[in-house]
Amino acid sequence: MPQDQLPLAPDFAREVIDVPVADEMSESFLAYSLSVITSRAIPDVRDGLKPVQRRILYSMLNMGIRPDGPHRKCARVVGDTMGNFHPHGDSAIYDALVRMGQDFAKNVTLIDPQGNFGSLDEPPAAHRYTECRLTNAAMSMLGELDENTVTFRPTYDGESTEPVYLPGLLPNLLVNGTSGIAVGMATSMAPHNLACLLYTSPSPRDATLSRMPSSA
């Protein structure tokens, strides 16, 4: 390439600051690990959902895919979630959607599946073949979002907002359990029977409820 067609050199900083490698590695690793923990891998204790799961449910709510309506193509849900809320691969979004609809993977499913959602031995069909809609349990997680019950934050492109966590009438973290592997941290929590949870504390007092994570 001729010299006059080469791209201009970037405008580097005029001052070079010496930083010990150990300090830079420690600081950069901490920032990266916190990003992975809070943005992808570890569920939020307030609703028991990872960001991708929460964004799928919120996207379906916005699309009007409710329990009393028809099923819609999973491909539409994956595309809307990826375009508006979760700028990552479609396979990761679809895997999370499918798992929320598998009754052998969840005590209480949040997705009502239609089509081949897989089994213990076989993977699900491609998202262009399967359909889904929210369950009543999912609606209990999403209820009262429009009543200033939770904090909202801007989406990745700043064009809209999304809930930081869901109101969560259903104790999803306890009922469905959770698992996640992040950078330097992992979590695994077994599911619990909903009837047992209700029997354990059938009439909690206001003081008890105020200390629960979802009230933070």
Regions found by a protein language model. Give the residues of each.
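Catalytic phosphate-handling regions of large nucleic-acid enzymes and associated NTPases
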Residues: 1-201, 205
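Positively charged, low-complexity/disordered segments
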Residues: 203-206, 210-216
